[in-house]
Amino acid sequence: MNAQALTDREFGQFQSWLYQAAGISLSEAKKALVAGRLFKRLKHYGLDSYGEYFKLIMNGQRTDELQVALDLLTTNETYFFREPKHFDFLRQHVLPHATPGKTFRLWSAASSSGEEPYSLAMTLAEGLGTTPWEVIGSDISSQVLAKARAGH
């Protein structure tokens, strides 16, 4: 195997696919990141180019590898109370309008391994008193969802 550098054309293919699959827009500045994250997959399959890997994941026969590529190319940056101003806004402008006795529900999209939905849960527990509430967390990455389910 003699893997070549990620060409602009190949990068464009991954950019388009990731945008269509996940709504994630990759700037040109992310080209090295894409190459670095996918290089081990080229080695794993003995492929010589990122274009060959793109064909492999897009041919419909390797949906498991398609998910691996998606997991590798999503950021998964997470920590508790990651965007403090969002939580301030929730406390100051949303929670005061919650209907007492009616379940207050929030969805944490792109919740990674769970820190964001847990942060929401702590905020709701503190701010809603006896009003019932629920938080749903989801993510496009099966790898981080498995981590969240395991409690890590």
Language-model-derived ranges and their functions:
Residues 102-152:
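Class I S-adenosyl-L-methionine-dependent methyltransferase module
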